[in-house]
Amino acid sequence: MAHQGKRVRAANEGIDRLKLYPLDEALALLKARTTAKFDETIEVAINLGVDPRHADQMVRGVCNLPNGSGRTVRVAVFARGAKADEAKAAGADIVGAEDLLETIQGGTIEFDRCIATPDLMPLVGRLGKVLGPRGLMPNPKVGTVTMDVKGAVAAAKGGAVEFRVEKAGIIHGGIGKASFPADKLAENIRAFVDAVVKAKPTGAKGTYVQRVAVSSTMGPGIKVDTASVVTA
């Protein structure tokens, strides 16, 4: 614990907690402090001017990161016949219908993204209480209920990141790894923020993107000047 505290103090040195850093400078500071023995995830946190308790202020969507997320994403697909074959050919890790339903009901959830063809949503709907709390329920708004199974699997494998505002009005997203070049991380962050801006709900009032911060798995949070990340 003492060693961990020393490492945290060292990581925080040289960071002004009150300063809003330009994105490039924030990433340079962050990458210099990623000293863990594994490839840390870089995360962005966005504070929005919304109250998600109101339906017209809910923010949800998906961002296709231009440089991928660096994660190995396991994809499950609910499909039958030709669409099941299409899913397998596209690289889906698990494909099925009633058999996949039974596997999940039995407590085995070995995937990070779930896709379904529209005709199987009545079947998938039975899993709402299992998949919903885990953020795995297929949803047409984020492209996971679709007949374009090939495209959905490719997007999931290639760096599509779903986002949903939390109760406090914050959105978190893993946008890459510490091993990514800083310019690739910056591109991913700007793409993610842009996707959140495009998902602005009709009920949002005042300043929509209020604060942005970046952090790593084991590193400090660094506040970012919103003008350096909001492209529109």
From Swiss-Prot:
Keywords: Repressor, Ribonucleoprotein, Ribosomal protein, RNA-binding, rRNA-binding, Translation regulation, tRNA-binding. Belongs to the universal ribosomal protein uL1 family. Coiled coil: none annotated. PANTHER family: 54S RIBOSOMAL PROTEIN L1, MITOCHONDRIAL, LARGE RIBOSOMAL SUBUNIT PROTEIN UL1M. Binds directly to 23S rRNA. The L1 stalk is quite mobile in the ribosome, and is involved in E site tRNA release. Protein L1 is also a translational repressor protein, it controls the translation of the L11 operon by binding to its mRNA. Pfam families: Ribosomal_L1 (PF00687). GO terms for biological process: regulation of translation; translation. GO terms for molecular function: rRNA binding; structural constituent of ribosome; tRNA binding. The keyword Transmembrane does not apply. One of its GO terms (cellular component) is cytosolic large ribosomal subunit. It comes from the Bacteria. This is Large ribosomal subunit protein uL1. Part of the 50S ribosomal subunit. The keyword Disulfide bond does not apply. Gene3D superfamilies: 3.30.190.20, 3.40.50.790.
